[in-house]
């Protein structure tokens, strides 16, 4: 997990003591910067926990969906042989319609 790779916690940063030298850093500036880092770490930690929980939930849902799909009855898929019957029927209907149009309107078309 990623939490194993993180070396510092917000508490570690808060409790860190720096030695000061003769012309060392300004303590207030260091403290303010460390406070910002602590807040960021806390936000990152909360976000990480939420994402891990969401990831676990989504994995559970995926497994449930897989199980449901495996247990659901398989729908039959129409075979390609069934489709030519429909196209033949449509062709027959179109031919009949054409013949009827010729019979009814045929004489008027040529006038």
From Swiss-Prot:
Its Gene Ontology cellular component terms are: cytoplasm
What keywords were assigned to this record?
Cell cycle, Cell division, Cell shape, Coiled coil, Cytoplasm
Q: Coiled coil: which residue ranges?
A: 34-72
Output the InterPro entries linked to this UniProt entry: Cell_cycle_GpsB, DivIVA_domain, DivIVA_fam
Recorded hits in Pfam families, A to Z, give: DivIVA (PF05103)
Answer whether the UniProt record assigns the keyword Ribosomal protein to this protein: no
Name its cellular compartments: Cytoplasm
Question: From which source organism is this entry?
Answer: Bacillus cytotoxicus (strain DSM 22905 / CIP 110041 / 391-98 / NVH 391-98)
Protein name stated in the entry:
Cell cycle protein GpsB
NCBIfam families (UniProt xref): DivI1A_domain, PRK14127.1
User: What is this protein's function per UniProt?
Assistant: Divisome component that associates with the complex late in its assembly, after the Z-ring is formed, and is dependent on DivIC and PBP2B for its recruitment to the divisome. Together with EzrA, is a key component of the system that regulates PBP1 localization during cell cycle progression. Its main role could be the removal of PBP1 from the cell pole after pole maturation is completed. Also contributes to the recruitment of PBP1 to the division complex. Not essential for septum formation.
> To which protein family does this belong?
Belongs to the GpsB family.
The subunit structure is:
Forms polymers through the coiled coil domains. Interacts with PBP1, MreC and EzrA.
Give a GO biological-process term: cell division
């Amino acid at each position: 997990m990623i939490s194993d790779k993180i070396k510092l916690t917000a508490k570690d940063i808060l409790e860190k003591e720096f030695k000061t030298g003769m012309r060392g850093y300004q303590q207030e500036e260091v403290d303010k910067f460390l406070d910002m880092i602590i807040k960021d770490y806390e936000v990152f930690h909360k976000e990480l926990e939420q994402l891990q929980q969401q990831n676990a939930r989504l994995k559970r849902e995926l497994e449930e969906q897989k199980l449901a799909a495996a247990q659901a009855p398989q729908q039959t898929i129409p075979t390609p042989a069934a489709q030519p019957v429909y196209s033949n029927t449509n062709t027959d209907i179109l031919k009949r319609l054409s013949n009827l149009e010729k019979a009814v309107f045929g004489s008027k078309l040529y006038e």
